[in-house]
Amino acid sequence: MDKFTVLTAIAAPLPVANVDTDKIIPARFLKTIKRTGLGTHLFDAMRYIDGQENPDFVLNREPYRQAQILVTHENFGCGSSREHAPWALLDFGIRCVIAPDFADIFYNNSFKNGILPIRLPRDICDRLMDDAGNGANSRLTVDLERQVVVRPNGEEIPFEIDPFRRHLLLNGLDDIGQTLQRREAIDRFEENRTVTQPWFPRITLPAN
């Protein structure tokens, strides 16, 4: 998983509340277990009309085709649980979503997949959305190390994040990465276990 430290990027405004996971990535695209290729179908129902790009949808317009930050409204990621939702966002290039609040499962899945979900009050999200609407001047900076969002005018907006989740993103650690951090202890345990319980096969962790 890629580290998240400081991100300065185009922010796309999506002024829609209650964007559920089926709007993020429709169920018909969930047959794959690959994390790549899903970005093409991100927001499929809003992004395409009869198989053609909807020119009015924000991610179909420049400079937002290169957006890495999404600013939206309440209850983002609600609906059914599907890890494909953060996969689709990440495959498109989105590394940070800013909203007043998120559905819990989507919020948790985002961290596990290297996406930073930031909760900020609605009035601040509206200000950031106004910033994001300025086309080529819509760049925001998200500084996870200092826990601030920096607007184009230089104003710094602080945000809260669980310290452990912050540590994981800063160091690019997913569940497997966390396990591999303890590989020496795991290897010692396995060596001892082959002596005390030789009937169990030894587990060998993959090389870094």
UniProtKB/Swiss-Prot annotation:
Kindly list the GO molecular function terms attached to this UniProt entry: 3-isopropylmalate dehydratase activity
Keyword tags: Amino-acid biosynthesis, Branched-chain amino acid biosynthesis, Leucine biosynthesis, Lyase
In the record, biological process GO terms are: L-leucine biosynthetic process
Among the Pfam families in the record, one is: Aconitase_C
Q: Sorted alphabetically, which InterPro entries does this protein's record hold?
A: 3-IsopropMal_deHydase_ssu (IPR004431), Aconitase/3IPM_dehydase_swvl (IPR015928), AconitaseA/IPMdHydase_ssu_swvl (IPR000573), IPMI_Swivel (IPR033940), LeuD (IPR050075)
Give the E.C. number(s).
Answer: 4.2.1.33
Pathway the protein contributes to: Amino-acid biosynthesis; L-leucine biosynthesis; L-leucine from 3-methyl-2-oxobutanoate: step 2/4
Q: Which GO terms describe its cellular component?
A: 3-isopropylmalate dehydratase complex
List the catalysed reactions.
(2R,3S)-3-isopropylmalate = (2S)-2-isopropylmalate
PANTHER family, per the entry: 3-ISOPROPYLMALATE DEHYDRATASE SMALL SUBUNIT, 3-ISOPROPYLMALATE DEHYDRATASE SMALL SUBUNIT 2-RELATED-RELATED
What family name appears in the similarity comment? Belongs to the LeuD family. LeuD type 1 subfamily.
Describe its partners and assembly state.
Answer: Heterodimer of LeuC and LeuD.
Note the HAMAP family from the entry. Answer: LeuD_type1
Q: What does this protein do?
A: Catalyzes the isomerization between 2-isopropylmalate and 3-isopropylmalate, via the formation of 2-isopropylmaleate.
Q: Name it.
A: 3-isopropylmalate dehydratase small subunit
What organism is recorded for this protein? Granulibacter bethesdensis (strain ATCC BAA-1260 / CGDNIH1)
Which gene is annotated as encoding this protein in its UniProt record? Answer: leuD
